[in-house]
Amino acid sequence: MIKSIRNLLYRPPAMPKSGEDFGDYQTNFVNAIRFTESCGFLVERPDWKPHERLEVEGSFLEPALRAAGVRDLTKAAFQCLKWSHYLAPHIEQQLGRKVWLTIGQIWKEDQALFSPTWNDLRSWSKQGITIEEMHKPGSAGLNLHAWLTVDSGEVIEPTMMTSIATLYPDTYSHFLCAIGWGQPADILSEHKYFPMAVGAEFAECLHSRSQIGLLASNPQELHSVPMAIVFGN
């Protein structure tokens, strides 16, 4: 009862209004867990291990992708939620450490590339996402970004670089099929991550209540592209 009352009374922190407003990623991540809990989902809290960083060589990736049945990374373009959710348990098993699906905003300098609000996420968790919502003026697809957070405080970015390469092949063809990992500020130059919701359960609820399938349960679904989810505002 007390927890239910706390969730009802919970008010999320202020949204960033510029690239200077992001603060500490780990603090924002814990705030995102608190918001997710207020929506009715259970999320394991992090026991941060900042000194146990991901290896620079990324040798964990190939066996994780192989176990996941990934055969064509170009299909990850514009499919951040589906790919991040699908890859999370495979990467977690390969690393032997906690990995969380993370949903939120991503900015380049002072411009939000994907900018869901707290109200958006809470509403989607209760009612799902409609096709009409994915075709709002000023948007072409699902206005959120998804990635993975590791218990070191680092992130793994499975899709953004391939999306950029697909949009701008003349300039960023070298990004195609690339996966990034490391400190949030180091993944992509001048890009910043703002976590807002955490965990597979939250994503699976969005999927089950939405008018379009958002996730994959097998490699065939992972590699299919029913709808391009591209840059929002």
Say what each PLM segment does:
Residues M1-N233:
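A structural boundary/capping signal
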